[in-house]
């Protein structure tokens, strides 16, 4: 799903795919958010990105971070309440088709 900066953006970064998938599952179940994309950095780091209203994204990121840490290594999490539109060009490299 293409991101244009119109909603809050939430990110959870992990070491490896297993905690990333666990985070994505919990993030999407925890709140009314949409999966934007994922990003692999090298062969180790995976970042999952979701969008939605600020409260939903905060809840989603918290649930994803807890889930990732329970099965692997969480390296970062962040909620950007209203990022500038140009951020969409960066985070939509591997956008997920709806």
Feature names for model-found ranges:
Residues 4-14:
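Short glycine-/aliphatic-rich beta-strand segments at the starts of folded cytosolic domains
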Residues 51-57:
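Helix N-cap motif at beta-to-alpha junctions
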Residues 31-32, 65-73:
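A common structural junction motif
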Residues 33-38, 76-77:
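A short linear hydrophobic-aromatic micro-motif
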Residues 86-98:
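Short, low-order "capping/linker" segments at domain edges
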Residues 70-82:
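Conserved short beta-strand edge segments in small beta-sheet-based binding/regulatory domains
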Residues 18-29:
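Short amphipathic alpha-helix segments
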Residues 10-12, 46-51:
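Short cationic amphipathic helices and targeting signals
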């Amino acid at each position: 799903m293409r991101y244009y900066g119109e909603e809050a953006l939430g990110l959870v970064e992990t070491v490896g795919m297993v905690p990333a998938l666990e985070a994505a599952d919990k993030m999407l179940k925890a709140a009314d958010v949409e999966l934007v994309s994922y990003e692999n950095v090298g062969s180790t780091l995976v970042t999952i990105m979701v969008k939605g209203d600020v409260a939903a994204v905060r809840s989603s990121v918290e649930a994803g971070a807890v889930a990732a840490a329970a099965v692997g290594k969480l390296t970062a999490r962040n909620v950007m309440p209203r990022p500038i539109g140009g951020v969409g060009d960066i985070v939509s490299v591997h956008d997920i088709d709806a």
